[in-house]
Amino acid sequence: MDHEIHSFIKRKLKGVGDVWFSYFMMSKNSTSQPYIISNYPEAWMKEYIKKEMFLSDPIIVASLARITPFSWDDNDIVTLRAKNQDVFISSVQHDISSGYTFVLHDHDNNVATLSIANHLEDANFEKCMKNHENDLQMLLVNVHEKVMAYQRAINDQDNPPDNSRNALLSPRETEVLFLVSSGRTYKEVSRILGISEVTVKFHINNSVRKLDVINSRHAITKALELNLFHSPCEPVVMKHMDAR
């Protein structure tokens, strides 16, 4: 997937010339290692990650407080660089000294950036960035959407949903739906379980919502398909019936 996204970014950046780029994504809630897709020199990327430079990188620090694109030569960036020169001094050794960064903050409290380095020292670089600002910002949005979708898919594989009876419906919801499926009225169910008819309807409505159907009949059909009326609920139901 990283290779696909790398190729996607590279293809979309053809219009702005032969540039180095870096997509960076990190949670604002933790200092865990960021997710990076880049064609920066490999030696620089290894040093950047090994020394955890992202924690003090002036570009990332600035991105945390901004929502609009910015040049690395902006006054506030220059000021941040002066306060923390280690990252800049190291990056210059790899021909990364000027560039432009696009910023995105998502609903999961992540910050994502698309940084484009002017490693060829093109005099028209900044003008080119400004001319393509909207397209490049949308590129960041599209890339970030792909990355998050990919990570969600991986997470779903690692943590598959629990489709057991108890994961879908509570024991009481299963009891109520089981009794209704056997042809009993809400009044009869309320008497068997010792609850009010209002509570019976409440549990039925919850079952309909959780099973993502439109009414109780459909809920019963889906519950049967999913084998939710498995034996665990039946002894409980029988206990209530015997107590009548």
Curated annotation (Swiss-Prot):
InterPro entries named in the record: Sig_transdc_resp-reg_C-effctor, TF_LuxR_autoind-bd_dom, TF_LuxR_autoind-bd_dom_sf, Tscrpt_reg_LuxR_C, WH-like_DNA-bd_sf
GO molecular function: DNA binding
UniProt entry tagged with the keyword ATP-binding: no
Residues of the HTH luxR-type domain: 162-227
UniProt GO BP: antibiotic biosynthetic process; quorum sensing; regulation of DNA-templated transcription
Gene: carR
Taxonomic lineage from the root: Bacteria, Pseudomonadati, Pseudomonadota, Gammaproteobacteria, Enterobacterales
Family: Belongs to the autoinducer-regulated transcriptional regulatory protein family.
Function description: Functions as an OHLL responsive transcriptional regulator which acts in the control of the biosynthesis of carbapenem antibiotics.
Keywords: Activator, Antibiotic biosynthesis, DNA-binding, Quorum sensing, Transcription, Transcription regulation
Chain residues forming the annotated DNA-binding region: 186-205
Matching CDD domains: LuxR_C_like (cd06170)
Xref: SMART domains: HTH_LUXR (SM00421)
The protein's name in its UniProt record: Transcriptional activator protein CarR
